[in-house]
Amino acid sequence: MAPVILVGIENTQRRRDMTGPTTVKKDRKIAPVVGGAAEFRRFIATELVPWVEANHPASERRGIIGESAAGLFIVESFFEMPGLFETSIALDPSLWWNAGKLAKDAGTWFMAHPETRGRLFVAWAEPETIGPNVRILEDALKQAAPSQLEWKVVARPDLSHGTIYRALAPVVLPMMYPPE
C-alpha cells in the first residue's frame, strides 16, 4: 500500500454530523438533532484539510472511508462538494435517508456534472434497507457516470452491516492506494 496519512475525525453527535436535511418525519426522530452534514463538511474542507496539508506532507490523493451514516455522509459529500476527496469509499451507506433522495437524484446529478472525476467505491451487505438504494445509485452510475469517474459497486451478502467495515477496509484501502 502507498504511504498515507490517516486522520480519524471524532464528532460529538454522529447522527447530526453525518446526515443532510430530510423531509421524512421518521428520519428526524432518530436523534435530537439531524441535518448537520453541510457544516461538518465545511469544517473538513476549510479547517481540517488546510491544517493537515500545512503540517504534514500530504498529497492531492485525499480520500475518505466510512460506513453506515458515515457512508451516507461520504456519498452526499461526493455530490455536494465534488473534488474535496479524490477517493470516496462508502461501506453499507445509509442511502435510505430522506427517502433515498441522494440515490434517486444521482442520475440527474451526473448528467449535470459531466466533468466529475475521482474514484467512488461503494459496498453493501444489508439487503433490505441499504441494498435497494445502493442499487438505484449503481444504476445511475451505469447509465450516466462521467467517463473520468472510476467507480465500483460491490454487493457483499456474506457480510453484515456490523461486519462490513472491519472486513473490507483492510482490503479496499490497499486496492485504492496501491504502492507507487
Question: Residue spans of the language-model regions?
Answer:
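Non-catalytic cap/lid and distal C-terminal segments of serine-dependent acyl enzymes
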Residues: 1-180
